[in-house]
Amino acid sequence: MLVLVTYDVNTETPAGRRRLRRIAKTCQNYGQRVQFSVFECNVDPAQWVKLRSKLLNEMDPKLDSLRFYFLGSNWQGRVEHEGAKEPRDLEGTLIL
């Protein structure tokens, strides 16, 4: 299933900047960045549970916010892209 993860982290303190880096790194481990604070994560249910848990453990609920948009398994017909930054194929081969 494709989950769109968005976040807004308060970066006024060093701790906030650390949270931002950790949340971004966690999202990068599960998906691709499509905007500064937006990631597309193509995950199975077990991966989703781990991703959500890691993100919730990193955030400060009094200062930060996370949003999850579930686009499901048939997401290809629900996502359109226009403009700069060619989209990457989430189903394609990833070379590290």
UniProtKB/Swiss-Prot annotation:
Its cofactor is Mg(2+). Pfam families: CRISPR_Cas2 (PF09827). Its EC number is 3.1.-.-. Mg(2+) binds at D8. One of its GO terms (biological process) is maintenance of CRISPR repeat elements. Signal peptide: none annotated. One of its GO terms (molecular function) is metal ion binding. Keywords: Antiviral defense, Endonuclease, Hydrolase, Magnesium, Metal-binding, Nuclease. Gene3D superfamilies: 3.30.70.240. It comes from the Bacteria. Homodimer, forms a heterotetramer with a Cas1 homodimer. Belongs to the CRISPR-associated endoribonuclease Cas2 protein family. CRISPR (clustered regularly interspaced short palindromic repeat), is an adaptive immune system that provides protection against mobile genetic elements (viruses, transposable elements and conjugative plasmids). CRISPR clusters contain sequences complementary to antecedent mobile elements and target invading nucleic acids. CRISPR clusters are transcribed and processed into CRISPR RNA (crRNA). Functions as a ssRNA-specific endoribonuclease. Involved in the integration of spacer DNA into the CRISPR cassette. This is CRISPR-associated endoribonuclease Cas2.
